[in-house]
Amino acid sequence: MFSIKPGPRKLPIDNPSLLSWNITDGDLNSKLNTLEYLNCVTNIINACGVYPQDLKDREIISTFHAEKVINDLLKNDYKISLSPDTTYRELNKAAQRSITAPDRIGEGKIWVYQRDTMVERGDNSGVHQYGPAEHFTHIISDKPSPKDKYVAYAINIPDYELAADVYNINVTSPSGQQETFKILINPEHLRQTLERKSLTAVQKSQCEIITPKKPGEAILHAFNATYQQIRENMSEFARCHYGYIQIPPVTTFRADGPETPEEEKGYWFHAYQPEDLCTIHNPMGDLQDFIALVKDAKKFGIDIIPDYTFNFMGIGGSGKNDLDYPSADIRAKISKDIEGGIPGYWQGQVLIPFTIDPVTKERKQIHPEDIHLTAKDFEASKDNISKDEWENLHALKEKRLNGMPKTPPKSDQVIMLQNQYVREMRKYGVRGLRYDAAKHSKHEQIERSITPPLKNYNERLHNTNLFNPKYHEKAVMNYMEYLVTCQLDEEQMSSLLYERDDLSAIDFSLLMKTIKAFSFGGDLQTLASKPSSTISSIPSKRRILININHDFPNNGNLFNDFLFNHQQDEQLAMAYMAALPFSRPLVYWDGQVLKSTTEIKNYDGSTRVGGEAWLNKGCSTYQQLYNEFHALYIDKAGIWSAFEGVFATKNVLAFSRGDSVNINHSPHDGLVIINKGNEEVEGAWPNKLQPGKYKNMGSNSVNIIINNTRKIIPPGKAFMLRGGTLNINIPGRSALLLGKTGEPLNYLYL
């Protein structure tokens, strides 16, 4: 049992008439004022989290009490500032319980349970419904779990409390004293509650809420990583300027199904072979792990983008033969667990709680142990795509891939589940999806499966008043993987992007062009932005740029043409991609949960691609700096390339960046120089720099020469320039990304 004594903290109490609270904790009975109560709540959260093992203690830190506390403080003329506590990571799964079903508490040691009741209907039939339970009521002694004698509790947490999180609450007294506490709140519900109170306009003006800024716009592909792995590294991802994290498909899948050949068990590709969309349970985590991940990411301003497999189903179980999904063995395990007294866990993994018939509008509840797809929901053909059919678009769209049953656009059940899947993802705060293997889908299927389109959403500004929120419009990050290997592919993808202006796409054509330019004998000038031509057929604001993805190293030699010849070329290419306006780079990381290829070597034993580049969580020093440059310049349209001189050769590409850049050599505030050759290059950049504070965001130290004095600027180093023409020395096999970050005092001018 923990103690809720106030502790030694010096509290900013100006008004002794603040609301008092009667608190009971074991043998301790205390009457505390509001700020002492906040101190107790802070101690509980620090020691036990928001879900203490003794469930009755959860009442002490409920959002209901938190809202009363904040109302009390505002009425007594205290100032309040609320901000997400990024140091707090909830480990107890009850905090992420589905809003429609129960879940377990205490890291799998205690189970939450809602009674299964029969609701009678007029035709004398009935439907099972997980009815409301009392809030933290009694132990159900006749429902022990078969595992370790778990105990089942009856519990019901309101939706608004499920969406609550731990916030720092900075309290300033009327005399100016300050203290910071922890509190559990749902900001939107707090606003709605306080609007009904008799607060004055002045009192309302004293409550601000700080929303985290997006740390960048780059995308991290957290391939083959658990949701927990990603959560543990969230602060590092924010530090490295990632604004989005693409994660493995959020479905039910397994890597060791009974129909899976022994030699294929444990491999990464099972993540892309779903066996159920309605229930979330896989080697990366379950629904509660996923909800916790989205919550943690939001604290840092990062959006989660799940991979979405919408056109095939998996082959690990009997479903590949009888086309009943989930497969029989999955349904049997769930039923056995439920009958064994632990229904709360599986019902807690239901992402899609019900479907709505498009004609009758009747709601049908989803149960995890039921069949959700049958033979009528799949293409009739059971033929596999053969090796010589990879450029046959008809075969790609009609046939199976590696034996996986193909879903058609005609199945109302498939479309209904897919649309509901997207809606449920939005409810949990997902602001984008990455649509896998779109090349294998007919346009009609993409049109029906990716609906209704959500093009934009309102995001709260960084620092606003709780009662007068201000928003800015953000575009949803929906993008597709449409593998382009020929001109017909290019035309098909362009047509699809024209039809759906809410979709972006991975730019495979630009990747191939970049690989060729960085290869031995290749010409970097083919990547230069010129007034009369474009570097890609995909509009710049809808381009996702990659230098590697999960498919290329993990399919034998099938995608060797999409691999760079050397790891350093791969890194330099990323510098180029991060420097382009409007587009977003996607950085690959292999979390190695399932078997995969993490390094490809040349014949001489040197690393061709991969190795450290794929295993450092996308957080190498150079990648952090690339992402920082990208965040500074993504929305600045200006780009001007040198077309002659030492910085415009087959081995050297250079261009200015910034809003003021144009063909008339206006002063600029960003400079990119990439030298793929082995020899250093020295010269004067013809476009003048604006005066100000600059930072080397490139991969290597560079020499800047002013008045015959050579200054070495290492990566990450900030320095001041008075402006004008820049004389610079670029080492071989390196990239310079020079960005203006401001003009503060106390920096030495070069």
UniProtKB/Swiss-Prot annotation:
Which InterPro entries does its entry note? Answer: A-amylase/branching_C, Glyco_hydro_13_cat_dom, Glyco_hydro_b, Glycoside_hydrolase_SF
Q: Name one GO biological process term.
A: carbohydrate metabolic process
Q: Which domain of life is it from?
A: Bacteria
Under Gene Ontology molecular function, one entry of this record is: cation binding
Task: List, alphabetically, the PANTHER family matched.
Answer: ALPHA-AMYLASE
Which named protein is this? Putative uncharacterized protein YgaQ
Quote the gene name from the UniProt entry. Answer: ygaQ
